[in-house]
Curated annotation (Swiss-Prot):
Cellular component GO terms held in the UniProt record: plasma membrane
Membrane topology, record value: Multi-pass membrane protein
InterPro entries the UniProt entry points to: DUF1328
Keywords, comma-separated and alphabetical: Cell membrane, Membrane, Transmembrane, Transmembrane helix
Protein name as catalogued: UPF0391 membrane protein ETA_06630
Domain of life: Bacteria
Major subcellular location class: membrane
Signal peptide: none
Length: 53
């Protein structure tokens, strides 16, 4: 999950450096969404724990 966030962040930085503002904004937004979803899933798994079968 965090790997995808970092990939989108790198894409946003490269696009911004090359002058593609719209693409950079979209990639940065996607990176934020992926990071938030990853953190939420991490917190849910942290609080629920492993269930014994």
């Amino acid at each position: 999950m965090f790997r995808w966030g970092i990939i989108f962040l790198v894409i946003a930085l490269i696009a911004a450096a090359l002058g593609f503002g719209g693409l950079a904004g979209t990639a940065a937004w996607a990176a934020k969404v992926v990071f938030v979803v990853g953190i939420v899933i991490f917190l849910i798994s942290l609080f629920t724990g492993r269930k014994k079968l």
